[in-house]
Design a protein with these regions (language model features):
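Hydrophobic ligand-binding cavity/cleft-lining segments
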Residues: 1-38
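A solvent-exposed, acidic/Ser-Thr-rich amphipathic alpha-helical stretch
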Residues: 36-50, 59-61
Length: 150
């Protein structure tokens, strides 16, 4: 497992960037960089289970991640603990594939920089997915910046 880090300076206050990153409609827009049709079910409230979903590019069936919000400090920090996967619409936290994701964290930090916001993303990734996320995350953050600054 490797830890990856990405950041982007966005010319807007933290609350605006926070909502653009986490509210349903803008989330669906900026996460197209990961998977066309991405969305989530659940809440960003601390302790809540949240499902990150979208069509599986190979099967067309619903797939994604089962996760828990480990921490939520409004406009400051979100910590997502991945618990497993969703395959064909079914949650899986026990298979070998699902266990690879268990205890992986994805953290978003929002820092004020003279009225702009520096978004930092830290995530734990299996070696086989490093290249994919190194390509997708910068695209996603650029799309988020574009949405907020337009």
């Amino acid at each position: 497992m490797q830890k990856l880090h990405f950041s982007m300076l966005i010319n807007a206050p933290k609350d605006i960037v926070w909502h653009a990153m986490l509210d349903d409609q803008p989330y669906r827009e900026w996460t197209k960089a990961f998977n066309e049709g991405s969305y989530y079910k659940g809440s960003w409230e601390k302790g809540s289970t949240i499902l990150f979903l979208g069509p599986d590019p190979n099967t067309g069936e619903e797939g994604g991640m089962v996760s828990r919000i480990a921490e939520n400090k409004l406009y400051e920090f979100i910590s997502i603990e991945h618990l497993g996967i969703v395959q064909n619409g079914v949650e899986d936290t026990t298979s070998e594939v699902a266990r690879k994701w268990a205890s992986a964290f994805e953290n978003y930090m929002f820092k004020d920089k003279d009225g702009a916001t520096e978004v930092h993303v830290d995530l734990d990734v299996e070696d086989e997915h490093v290249e994919m996320f190194n390509e997708m995350w910068p695209k996603g953050l650029r799309k988020l910046k574009e949405l907020v600054e337009k």
